[in-house]
């Protein structure tokens, strides 16, 4: 195996580096006009420094996105839909608890689906309670992973810490 660097023949800017079979060195620069290739030794390559804070933040975002994907298995995604769910739950709990208050969301849905507001309220409360349990499981996994990433001291530990077994959250 040979180590090589491909560079712009006009500017000297390094374009890429790598390893190849002994007979393939000349082929490494044939991809574009103006590229040149040079065989180098391992000592010539320095590993680029990695910004661990940027890696950590990228992993946080990846964890959050994955958690949102899992949530979407149980509820309709979207912040406006989430607000409607909360409003319907508030109305449903008021109906179940015998409170007298307007129920525009439940009334509209009951009329559209042909069920009573009372039956719909019971169903909404049951679904909200089931969702709360799932949401708590998802949130615990999400926060645990982010806490592990925060404590990790190198990129390998960060990568391992960010792994979440979302399959724990049953359907």
Task: List each model region and its residues.
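A short, compositionally biased
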Residues: 1-3, 32-33
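A short, surface-exposed interaction/processing loop segment used at functional sites
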Residues: 26-36
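A preference for well-ordered globular domain cores
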Residues: 2-27, 41-171
């Amino acid at each position: 195996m040979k180590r090589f660097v491909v560079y712009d023949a006009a500017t000297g800017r390094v374009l890429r580096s790598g390893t190849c079979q002994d007979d393939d060195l000349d082929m490494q620069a044939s991809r574009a006009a103006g590229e040149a290739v040079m065989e180098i030794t391992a000592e010539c390559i320095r590993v680029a420094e990695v910004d661990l804070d940027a890696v950590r933040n990228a992993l946080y975002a990846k964890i959050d996105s994955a958690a949102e994907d899992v949530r979407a298995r149980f509820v309709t995604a979207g912040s406006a839909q989430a607000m409607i769910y909360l409003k319907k739950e508030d109305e449903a709990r008021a109906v179940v608890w015998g409170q007298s208050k307007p129920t525009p969301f439940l009334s509209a849905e009951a009329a559209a689906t042909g069920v009573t507001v009372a039956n719909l309220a019971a169903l909404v409360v049951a679904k909200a309670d089931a969702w709360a349990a799932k949401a708590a499981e998802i949130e615990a996994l999400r926060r645990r992973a982010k806490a592990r990433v925060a404590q990790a001291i190198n990129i390998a530990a960060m990568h391992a810490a960010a792994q979440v077994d979302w399959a724990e959250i049953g359907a």
